[in-house]
Structures are given as C-alpha cells and as structure tokens.
C-alpha cells in the first residue's frame, strides 16, 4: 500500500453539534495522521469555487448555502491508502445508505448535512488540499 494524503472537511452541522473531537478520534484510531488543520467560515465565493464541478446541478445552490452556514474544519490526513480508507470510514454520501459505525451514519443530519467531505481520488485530494492549504501549512509526521 502507498502512503497517501487526502483532504477532509468536517461540515457545519457536525461542527455545530460538537462532533469535532469524536470525528478526530475516529481518524486517529483508523491510523490517520492529521498533518494540517484549520477552522474557517467559507464565503459564498470560496464555497462556489471549491464545488465548481457541481455548478449547474440541482443541489449546487443548497450545497453552497449549507457550506457557508457556519464554521467548518478542513484537514489533511495522511496514511496508507488514505483516499479509499477515508471514504470507507465516511460511509455512503446519503446517510440513509451509510453502514452503521461510519461517520455519516453516526453524525449526519441529512443528505446535504452529511457531516463530512472527503476526496474521491488522489488527484482531487491534491487539488482540494492546495485550495485550502499552502505547502508551509502542512506538517508531515513520521
């Protein structure tokens, strides 16, 4: 297996519900190292830019509105096969379909307010990490 980095967001509902620590505990117990993290409140422009690939889809405006509704936590996770393993612990996008014990099964409020975001490929992880973090904000830990 290859050591990878993936990008993760703890969404506004999970921040508001005080689930940050529980989610971080899951990341660490799954073997991820958190090598960059920050809390921020997205502007409409930042959210639209981040989710630009979804522009024109029926859910886009609601997603932007939700993602700007409160603070989020963005982080870079590092570990073996990080992209897929992070997707596995997140669970299905629709929390109604998420397996018990996954982040979305445990912390999501709805399809849009599904607690977490994670990169879907190594290439998108690189792009998403660069959207929120400068190279000097990432601290690999061995």
From Swiss-Prot:
GO biological process entries: CTP biosynthetic process; GTP biosynthetic process; UTP biosynthetic process
Classification lineage: Bacteria, Pseudomonadati, Pseudomonadota, Gammaproteobacteria, Enterobacterales
One CC-aspect GO term: cytoplasm
Cofactors that this protein relies on: Mg(2+)
Active site positions, chain numbering: 117
Origin: domain of life: Bacteria
Binding-site positions, ATP: 11, 59, 87, 93, 104, 114
Species: Yersinia pseudotuberculosis serotype O:3 (strain YPIII)
Protein name, as recorded: Nucleoside diphosphate kinase
Gene3D superfamilies named in the record: Nucleoside diphosphate kinase-like domain (3.30.70.141)
HAMAP family, A to Z: NDP_kinase (MF_00451)
